[in-house]
């Protein structure tokens, strides 16, 4: 019987934060941002394993306390790109080809439990797999040089990709073993290069990615509301 496992690529530096450390280790409500991400995943009982892929020379991880759970595994096999980190993590995970792998951004620390449940419920019998995503709600503008509007782009049929992105381990390994160009920015786009069509599963606006300093403020507010409601 196939299992579900989560894989969190956490080998990046997060340079856009302008911080003194990789953003996954920034303090968020008294714990590293990554710790909140892992707690969200470990709260899902259907995840048999939660794998974190770190850079081989990571000097930050061991400085912090992490959730104590036998399902949590640390792999220091991260690569220069996200795709390399995910591929290396798959190679070292020893997962069966038909196991489901849920790749989740380290910086999406507010993943709502019902969104994760919805993803697994929707895709566990799907022939391809898919990802959490949200329909684009805002008007889109394409720019020219000098930040002038070149045109208004129709948002019809456009979605914002989120994570987790859920695919069979064998299929994902095959997709990531192929030469990839800059157009492949997530697992779903690699799967698309195989001629397959991932399914879009409605995500959640709270499942945002911490990218800029102001995102930390929003994440603190979301986590504070969650804690207040417990």
Curated annotation (Swiss-Prot):
Report the InterPro entries cross-referenced here. IspD (IPR001228), IspD/TarI (IPR034683), IspD/TarI_cytidylyltransf_bact (IPR050088), ISPD_synthase_CS (IPR018294), Nucleotide-diphossugar_trans (IPR029044)
Query: Could you state a single Gene Ontology molecular function term?
Result: 2-C-methyl-D-erythritol 4-phosphate cytidylyltransferase activity
- Which residue windows are transmembrane per the record? none
Keyword Nucleotidyltransferase appears in the UniProt entry? yes
According to UniProt, this protein's pathway is: Isoprenoid biosynthesis; isopentenyl diphosphate biosynthesis via DXP pathway; isopentenyl diphosphate from 1-deoxy-D-xylulose 5-phosphate: step 2/6
Catalyzed chemical reaction(s): 2-C-methyl-D-erythritol 4-phosphate + CTP + H(+) = 4-CDP-2-C-methyl-D-erythritol + diphosphate
Which biological process, per GO, is one annotated for this protein? isopentenyl diphosphate biosynthetic process, methylerythritol 4-phosphate pathway
Its top-level enzyme class, in one word, is transferase
Q: Where is this site: Positions MEP for the nucleophilic attack?
A: 155, 209
SUPFAM superfamilies per UniProt: Nucleotide-diphospho-sugar transferases
* Keyword annotations: Isoprene biosynthesis, Nucleotidyltransferase, Transferase
> What CDD domains would the database entry show?
CDP-ME_synthetase
EC number(s) per UniProt?
A: 2.7.7.60
What residues does the record give for site: Transition state stabilizer?
16, 23
Q: Which family does it belong to?
A: Belongs to the IspD/TarI cytidylyltransferase family. IspD subfamily.
Give the protein's biological function. Catalyzes the formation of 4-diphosphocytidyl-2-C-methyl-D-erythritol from CTP and 2-C-methyl-D-erythritol 4-phosphate (MEP).
What PANTHER family does its record include?
2-C-METHYL-D-ERYTHRITOL 4-PHOSPHATE CYTIDYLYLTRANSFERASE, CHLOROPLASTIC
List the protein's name. Answer: 2-C-methyl-D-erythritol 4-phosphate cytidylyltransferase
Gene that this polypeptide is encoded by: ispD
């Amino acid at each position: 019987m196939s299992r579900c496992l989560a894989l969190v690529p956490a080998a990046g530096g997060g340079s856009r934060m302008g911080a003194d450390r990789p953003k996954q280790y920034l303090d968020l409500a008294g714990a590293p941002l990554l710790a909140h991400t892992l707690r969200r995943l470990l709260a899902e009982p259907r995840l048999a394993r939660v794998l974190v892929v770190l850079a081989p020379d990571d000097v930050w991880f061991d400085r912090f306390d992490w959730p104590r759970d036998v399902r949590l595994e640390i792999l220091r096999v991260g690569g220069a790109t996200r795709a390399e980190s995910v591929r290396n993590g798959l190679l070292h995970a020893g997962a069966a080809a038909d196991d489901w792998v849920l790749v989740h951004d380290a910086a999406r620390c507010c993943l709502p439990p019902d969104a994760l449940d919805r993803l697994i419920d929707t895709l566990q019998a799907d022939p391809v797999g898919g990802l959490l995503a949200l329909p684009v709600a805002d008007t889109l503008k394409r720019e020219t040089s000098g930040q002038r509007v070149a045109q208004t782009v129709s948002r019809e049929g456009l979605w914002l990709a989120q994570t987790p992105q859920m695919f069979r381990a064998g299929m994902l390994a095959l997709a990531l073993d192929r030469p990839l160009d800059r157009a492949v920015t997530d697992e779903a786009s690699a799967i698309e290069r195989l001629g397959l069509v991932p399914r879009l599963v409605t995500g959640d606006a709270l499942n945002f990615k911490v990218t800029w300093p102001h995102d930390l403020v929003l994440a603190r507010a979301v986590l504070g509301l969650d804690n207040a409601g417990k």
